[in-house]
């Protein structure tokens, strides 16, 4: 199963390697066991060196293995997943830790950094206030009321920004 995720800092700011993603990214057909989590592979800097798909590929790095810290299912919840990598991220990976806060203030603008269909990194931009919404999906799945952010992506030079399978879990 391919998804996106974000490396997030914690209040201790000690660079503990937490990954925030989407709960539905865990393949529910495969049991979430320590053995299986130790096979999860995380890619860093999986991107092109420029904005065009024909630009050269950057040197990416990987880390394998994690522990599940917390998960909130999509059905009746917010579809959240928090993982902890089994090892610290080497400094030479030049990894970026996302910040966060507990406020209820919606983002006025922002970007979604993601890997649609497992592709190299893409960036989707929004410039309208994110609004809370309830997720309604297939198979009568309904998220918790107002537990999701709804954003409208902007048009870009090559069309418009989108997300697709593999983008789930992106910041």
Where in this protein do the model-derived segments appear?
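Beta-propeller and closely related beta-sheet repeat lectin domains
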Residues: 4, 169-170
């Amino acid at each position: 199963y391919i998804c996106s995720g974000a490396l997030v800092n914690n209040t201790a700011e000690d660079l503990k390697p937490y990954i925030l993603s989407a709960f539905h990214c865990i393949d529910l057909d495969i049991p979430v066991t320590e053995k299986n989590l130790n096979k999860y592979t995380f890619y860093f800097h999986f991107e092109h060196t420029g904005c065009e798909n024909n630009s050269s590929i950057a040197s990416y790095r990987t880390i394998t293995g994690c522990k599940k810290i917390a998960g909130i299912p999509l059905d009746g919840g917010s579809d959240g997943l928090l993982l902890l990598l089994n090892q610290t991220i080497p400094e030479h990976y030049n990894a970026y830790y996302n910040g966060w806060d507990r406020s209820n203030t919606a983002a006025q603008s922002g970007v979604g950094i993601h890997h649609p269909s497992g592709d190299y990194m893409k960036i989707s931009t929004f410039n309208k206030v994110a609004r809370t919404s309830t997720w309604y999906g297939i198979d009568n799945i309904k998220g918790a009321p107002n537990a999701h952010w709804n954003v409208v992506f902007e048009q870009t030079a090559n069309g418009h920004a989108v997300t697709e399978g593999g983008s789930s879990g992106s910041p």
